Amino acid sequence: MAETKIIYHMDEEETPYLVKLPVAPERVTLADFKNVLSNRPVHAYKFFFKSMDQDFGVVKEEIFDDNAKLPCFNGRVVSWLVLAEGAHSDAGSQGTDSHTDLPPPLERTGGIGDSRPPSFHPNVASSRDGMDNETGTESMVSHRRERARRRNRDEAARTNGHPRGDRRRDLGLPPDSASTVLSSELESSSFIDSDEEDNTSRLSSSTEQSTSSRLVRKHKCRRRKQRLRQTDRASSFSSITDSTMSLNIITVTLNMERHHFLGISIVGQSNDRGDGGIYIGSIMKGGAVAADGRIEPGDMLLQVNDVNFENMSNDDAVRVLREIVSQTGPISLTVAKCWDPTPRSYFTIPRADPVRPIDPAAWLSHTAALTGALPRYGTSPCSSAITRTSSSSLTSSVPGAPQLEEAPLTVKSDMSAIVRVMQLPDSGLEIRDRMWLKITIANAVIGADVVDWLYTHVEGFKERREARKYASSMLKHGFLRHTVNKITFSEQCYYVFGDLCSNLASLNLNSGSSGASDQDTLAPLPHPSVPWPLGQGYPYQYPGPPPCFPPAYQDPGFSCGSGSAGSQQSEGSKSSGSTRSSHRTPGREERRATGAGGSGSESDHTVPSGSGSTGWWERPVSQLSRGSSPRSQASAVAPGLPPLHPLTKAYAVVGGPPGGPPVRELAAVPPELTGSRQSFQKAMGNPCEFFVDIM
């Protein structure tokens, strides 16, 4: 009795299923196939079958009519069951990008993202974005699939009556290469498409005719992960040599005897002025171009064999390329290399080699120690150590600053912390300048690489599609940004990282400091008896005055707080909230100043609004002139303290730092700078309250 073997692939399962129908191959229909799958929700699937087209060769054809005859090859039918949610097909050729992302017909070793026009793959966004939706049907199918997977694992499913383990052992294959055995049973034109990350293998088929024609008809070709280019170049030779690597036009001759298909997709550009040339859209794994490795996505195809594409329309170029591929013999491709204005990719450090970050504080302290440079005025020798130890508190004051070495990254970690780790030089994510339609995108990443990185480096993702959903949420929250601001995530697109500095506006130096050891320390102030330098910094500590010098001039009119202006407790009175100064009335101060022989009038003495210890007693500028008598200075000193020695003009000149320019007296400042002079005098009363040196 005649029977038909049907091999069908389900979702993400690495091993296809085999069923036998007691129907002749030329009479089997889709209804017969669905009857065998009665334990599965067939209404939730689309059915694709391996078929032969007269123009394009081997294709995947969608069949939805139950009475339609199934295409048969060598007495067997090859089918793919794709979930209807998120699955779309292009002209009945392939419905690859389903909810579970299977099966990719040919993986590309490199691509240019969405550089192809929208007509090239119209359903790319909708087909990929359907993965973000969870439906009840999907949950039911996932439950059934998991149950079937456990049953297959327990019963050690057989293929054609042979256990998988025995067949692998007989062929000398590793335990995880089950689909490699099946490739010889299906058809000689099949080859294995492996994904090491997901440990899955799927069967795809292609021939010379279908490779070029399928791309001409603008079928979508999925690139799951960017692969390292193969280094096997024994089957090809080229006229280019090491001395001519600077040329941007190369000719590569490919030996088609070893590789059965060319393995490239082409993109044609057109505008109002005509066709703009043929470009390499993507390179497929296992083809002759991928094995050679010198032709890259984005290169312009100039000539194939002896046919020049320069003055040829896109349709004619496609027709010529189809004819040449269908013939036997070597193929010579002349391409213009994609010009990269910043060729970082040729000189980058391998991703596996970590790049150590530089600590600026440690570098500065080390440089200062070697060169013997003295610290700036107002800093202590241990200021660099203070800066180094306080770097953690400064980092913690930035909102959302990650603690990179405290805990591993999980799905519950802050998304901004994960993005910062992704941007590190040794993170393993390939971030570089990329070309898209001859437009340079600086520091861009591919969506598939982002998903793979999240699935590998972030704990908590059970499946890869969960990592993809997380990447989609990163795009929605602004941590990833598309070149043309697309809001839907696609693994084929290029993305740049969003602006992570938006939270710096809320920077607070006091946040994150739990104790005194975490807080930054101010540098030591100059000696209180030394005149404050007038805005000049010197690379040494200012020395204290010799004993022969008189004490520095201190004006009681600018003391804050207590009535004893010259004492050391004025600041303490202010901080303790003393109200002693509130009892001082303007009349008392005026009588005191007038009786001391000052030159001011009663109208010169004003009291600011609000009383209390925090108020400032203003004093007219005229009392600071050189005409002030020694008697006024002596009488202004608080009781119980010795009178100050008069400050002469000569001391004012020599009072500056040694070796520096002479210090100009405040009275010599032009009148139009009165406001600045008064504020400076206030600051000199208690400089610690005005000048804060933040390390």
UniProtKB/Swiss-Prot annotation:
Residues 622-635 have a biased composition (Polar residues). The keyword Cytoplasm applies. One of its GO terms (molecular function) is small GTPase binding. GO terms for cellular component: axon; clathrin-coated vesicle; cytoplasmic vesicle; cytosol; dendritic spine; glutamatergic synapse; growth cone; lateral plasma membrane. Residues 142-151, 215-228 have a biased composition (Basic residues). High levels are seen in the brain, testis and kidney, lower levels in the ovary, breast, muscle, liver and small intestine, and very low levels are seen in the spleen and thymus. A moderate level expression is seen in the heart. This is Segment polarity protein dishevelled homolog DVL-1. SMART domains: DAX (SM00021), DEP (SM00049), PDZ (SM00228). Participates in Wnt signaling by binding to the cytoplasmic C-terminus of frizzled family members and transducing the Wnt signal to down-stream effectors. Plays a role both in canonical and non-canonical Wnt signaling. Plays a role in the signal transduction pathways mediated by multiple Wnt genes. Required for LEF1 activation upon WNT1 and WNT3A signaling. DVL1 and PAK1 form a ternary complex with MUSK which is important for MUSK-dependent regulation of AChR clustering during the formation of the neuromuscular junction (NMJ). Residues 1-85 form the DIX domain. Ubiquitinated; undergoes both 'Lys-48'-linked ubiquitination, leading to its subsequent degradation by the ubiquitin-proteasome pathway, and 'Lys-63'-linked ubiquitination. The interaction with INVS is required for ubiquitination. Deubiquitinated by CYLD, which acts on 'Lys-63'-linked ubiquitin chains. Changing D449I: Reduces activity in Wnt signaling. It holds the Pfam family DIX. PROSITE patterns: DEP (PS50186), DIX (PS50841), PDZ (PS50106). GO terms for biological process: axon extension; axon guidance; axonogenesis; canonical Wnt signaling pathway; cochlea morphogenesis; collateral sprouting; convergent extension involved in neural plate elongation; convergent extension involved in organogenesis. Disruption phenotype: Mice display abnormalities in social behavior and sensorimotor gating. Residues 152-171 have a biased composition (Basic and acidic residues). Belongs to the DSH family. Interacts with CXXC4. Interacts (via PDZ domain) with TMEM88. Interacts with BRD7 and INVS. Interacts (via PDZ domain) with VANGL1 and VANGL2 (via C-terminus). Interacts (via PDZ domain) with NXN. Interacts with ARRB1; the interaction is enhanced by phosphorylation of DVL1. Interacts with CYLD. Interacts (via PDZ domain) with RYK. Self-associates (via DIX domain) and forms higher homooligomers. Interacts (via PDZ domain) with DACT1 and FZD7, where DACT1 and FZD7 compete for the same binding site. Residues 251-323 form the PDZ domain. Keywords: Cell membrane, Cytoplasm, Cytoplasmic vesicle, Developmental protein, Membrane, Phosphoprotein, Ubl conjugation, Wnt signaling pathway.
